[in-house]
């Protein structure tokens, strides 16, 4: 059976973007990054209105948009707010992703969906699950260098994810310590196995 729908999971800084790039360029998969879908939600006026109902004013700009630095800090420091936001954003993102998966199946396309926050329902939609991991110091360095987080912020964000509990759901675990050729070779092995 052809495995056309791939779930690419792993924690922040694990190198999922590199894997997605290779799947797109080398193996001709269409790709979706669920965090980008989430960011689109944060631009939606109705969604922002729902957030304004319970978030403090300090996380919003004067024009009503989110002040992302303040928003991120709040979510890192307050798990109650983080969980409330997640209960709003996650269903929207999963619904959009599910629609794209069904469309890809109808069209006979190949689709790789990346997320750092999987759940069992999402994983059940995929034909195969690829877990991307990297050593903690590398993950922290990537988040500091590429996204501008402090080391403390990076560590807190990584630790808040609890992604490792999904490692056992994976059909393949890919080590991504930074050598792109090794990652490409590992992806070739994965694609051949599925």
Residue ranges of model-derived segments:
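Hydrophobic anchor at the beta1->P-loop junction of P-loop NTPases
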Residues: 6-8
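ATP-binding Walker
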Residues: 14
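Walker A/P-loop
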Residues: 17
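Short beta-strand-centered segment that lines the nucleotide-binding/catalytic pocket of NTP-utilizing
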Residues: 29-43
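ATP-dependent small-molecule kinase phosphotransfer cores
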Residues: 40-107
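ATP-dependent NMP and nucleoside kinases share a basic, alpha-helical "lid"
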Residues: 98-106, 110-146
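Small-molecule kinase domains that catalyze NTP-dependent phosphoryl transfer to phosphate-bearing small molecules
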Residues: 124-125, 145-194
């Amino acid at each position: 059976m052809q495995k056309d729908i791939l779930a690419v999971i792993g924690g922040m800084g694990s190198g999922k973007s590199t894997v997605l790039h290779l799947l797109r360029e080398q193996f001709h998969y269409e790709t979706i990054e669920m965090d980008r879908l989430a960011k689109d939600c944060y631009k939606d006026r109705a969604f922002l209105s729902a957030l304004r109902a319970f978030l403090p004013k300090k996380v919003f700009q004067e024009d009503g948009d989110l002040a992302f630095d303040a928003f991120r800090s709040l979510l890192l420091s307050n798990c109650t707010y983080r969980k409330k936001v997640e209960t709003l954003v996650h269903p929207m993102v999963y619904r959009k992703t599910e629609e794209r998966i069904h469309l890809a199946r109808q069209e006979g396309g190949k689709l790789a969906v990346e997320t750092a926050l999987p759940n069992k329902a999402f994983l059940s939609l995929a034909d195969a699950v690829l877990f991307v991991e990297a050593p903690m110091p590398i993950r922290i360095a990537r988040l500091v260098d590429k996204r501008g987080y402090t080391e403390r912020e990076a560590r807190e964000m990584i630790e808040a994810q609890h992604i490792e509990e999904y490692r056992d759901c994976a059909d393949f675990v890919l080590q991504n310590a930074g050598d792109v050729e090794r990652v490409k070779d590992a992806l070739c092995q994965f694609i051949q196995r599925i």
